[in-house]
Amino acid sequence: MILDTSFLIDLFDGQRHAFEKGQQLSDEGAVQRVPSPVVTELSYGAAFGDEDERRAVRNALRMYPVVEQTDRIAQRAGRLLARADMDADGRSGIDKVDPMVAAVADRYDEPVLTANVADFEALGVAVETY
């Protein structure tokens, strides 16, 4: 399972459905991966918080394997975004991080766990929500 930023933020914020989904994945023994661009987004957000928030993010991220952006994944991300933009006449509105997350999902043939369903569906990858 590829964990998107939206899921991890909801999990950190104590959102019940996110917690229950995380518990389900743990109970099932599912591998939960965090793409490195998600780490970037979380670190950016935490930088605006206090030391407790920064520590909480660092500690939480230690629980998951981080998938680095390789050349292959980066190229796939570009193709996924280009296809989504072409399908939407150049106006998909998808940011640059979501295709990088989607490319990791494509590489591992795993769904993205997110609250941001529409963008990931437009990128053509499997999606789960909570």
Stretches with model-predicted labels:
Residues 65-85:
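Acidic catalytic patch
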Residues 7-8, 38, 73, 101, ...:
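Alpha-helix capping/helix-boundary segments
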